[in-house]
Regions:
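Nucleotide-activated sugar donor-binding and catalytic core shared by glycosyltransferases
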Residues: 1-164
């Protein structure tokens, strides 16, 4: 509860920002997080809560926003593709390869606010505009199928009999 309140306390200061929350993952404590977010949304008119945006709407959403904040892998894997900022909270994604658009921060109000200031500077987006996207450029399934078709599968799929 302390962590979600740190986050919400920081977000409360972003009066000129539109804030959209989506359902927290199935992690321990998600009911508390959801409850606190719903309370926040009731008293902060610049914020909204949606259970889910759905896949198509979610990617359309990522294209439109300036940043996302949270500890979801989406901020590490998908958001950099759109050349947008991710404020990655805590250590849940620790050890993953991250783009320059990802800012790893502690779940502390002041750290969160400093990060929002950092991404509001024009230099931040100039820097990430040409940053490398580490997770490919799409089309992996087509490349996989192409490789599988080249394999000599006569022996590959043959079951072996073991006499016990």
């Amino acid at each position: 509860k302390k962590q979600i309140n740190e986050i919400l306390s920081a977000l409360k200061e972003l009066k000129d920002s539109l804030i959209i929350f989506t359902m927290p993952g199935a992690d321990l404590g998600n009911k508390i997080i959801k409850k606190e977010i719903k309370k926040f949304v009731k008293i902060n008119k610049n914020s909204f809560f949606r259970e889910s945006l759905g896949q198509v709407n979610y990617f359309s959403f990522l294209r439109q926003v300036d940043a996302i904040i949270g500890n979801s892998s989406s901020g590490i894997l998908e958001m950099p593709y759109f050349k947008k900022a991710t404020l990655n909270l805590g250590n849940r994604q620790l050890g993953r390869l991250c783009s320059q658009s990802v800012i790893n921060i502690k779940i502390k109000k002041n750290d969160i606010l400093k990060s929002f200031k950092k991404i509001s500077l024009p230099n931040f987006y100039k820097r990430i505009k040409n940053s490398k996207f580490f997770y490919g450029n799409g089309g992996s399934s087509k490349r996989i199928v192409k490789i599988l078709r080249k394999l000599d599968n006569k022996n590959l799929f043959q079951k072996k009999f073991f006499n016990i």
